[in-house]
Structures are given as structure tokens and as C-alpha cells.
Amino acid sequence: MDAVAVSMAEGMQEPNMKPKRSLMLSGTFGFFQFIMPVLGFALVGTVFGFAKVLMKYVSAISTILLLYLSIKMFYSAYLKFRNKETEELQGNLMFQAIGTSVDALSLGFTFSHYSLGRVFLASFIIGIVTFFLCQIGIFIGKKFGTLFSGKADLLGGVILLLVIFLF
């Protein structure tokens, strides 16, 4: 849900998003949702103690990253309100993708009793579903972004805060 919420917020910020950018966003989120459970599975097999400790903090790490993204959106809305240019953060998409897929890493920890083939299949399905849900989120976000043109950053920040507190 958090990758979809971020996709929706991106769509609101950029209502005229080109299909290439939309595919890149959804593809990046889908890829990270695919690779993180595989990575979690690998960590359990090799570094079990570290994985157990990390699992305790997955929720906090994810919350902090999403809170940062929400604050960044509020700041961007403030700059637009003050008629100033917003700065584009390099690597922002990767930061968003990692922040929204940390929970998928912990899912990989629970795959320890599966075969590698089953882990890849389950992770592939998760990645594909994430890709399509993010496409839908971007589409909805673009519609709302057009509707709320000047307030898209503010609304995107509110949506991310809701994700943090509700999920």
C-alpha cells in the first residue's frame, strides 16, 4: 500500500506525467518489491542473527523513511506557495523505492522454509502486482493532481502521513 500511496502522490505532483516516467516509477517500485523478499530470504540463510534484529526495526525504519518523504512534500508545497522553485533530490526515486519496500524485506525472512524457486515465484508475483497497483495509483493521482492543481504536494504529504498512521 505504501508504494501505491507514493505513486499516487507522484501522480498528483506531476499530472502531465509521461508514460515513460510512469512506467519507470511503477517498474522501480515493482522491482524493489520483488527483490527485497529475495534478499530477506538470502539474509535468513546467511546472517540469521542480523535478520532477527533487523526484523524488530523494519516498521520503524519504514515509518521514518515515509515520514521524511511526507515532510519533503510539505516543504515542496510551502516553496510553491512562496513562489520559489523546488529543488529536485537526486536519487529520490531510489529512496522512495527502498523506503516503501523495507517491509517486503521482512517478508523474505518468513520464506526461510520455502525452496528458492517458490521464493522467486512469490516475489515475482508481489513485484508484478505492485507494478500494476502503482500504475493505477499514478493514474488516480494524476486525476486528483489536475483537480487540486496547486495543492498536489500538500495532499500527497497528507496521504503519506495517513499511510504511516493507518498501516
Predicted ranges, named:
Residues S7-R21, I71-N83, C134-S149:
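C-terminal ends of transmembrane helices
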Residues F34-A42, G99-H113, L161-F167:
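Hydrophobic alpha-helical transmembrane segments in multi-pass integral membrane proteins
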Residues M1-F48, S112-G117:
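Juxtamembrane transmembrane-helix termini in multi-pass membrane transport proteins
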Residues R21, L25-F29, Q33, P37, ...:
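Alpha-helical transmembrane segments of multi-pass membrane proteins, especially transporters
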Residues Q33, A51-Y78, F148-F167:
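Selective transmembrane alpha-helices of multi-pass membrane proteins
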Residues M1-V4, K56-L65, V119-F132:
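Structural signature of hydrophobic alpha-helical transmembrane segments
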Residues R21-T28, T86-M94, S149-V158:
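Cytoplasmic-side transmembrane-helix entry/capping segments in multi-pass membrane proteins
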Residues M1-A3, S76-L79, E85-G99, F124:
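Small-residue-enriched transmembrane helix starts and helix-helix packing motifs
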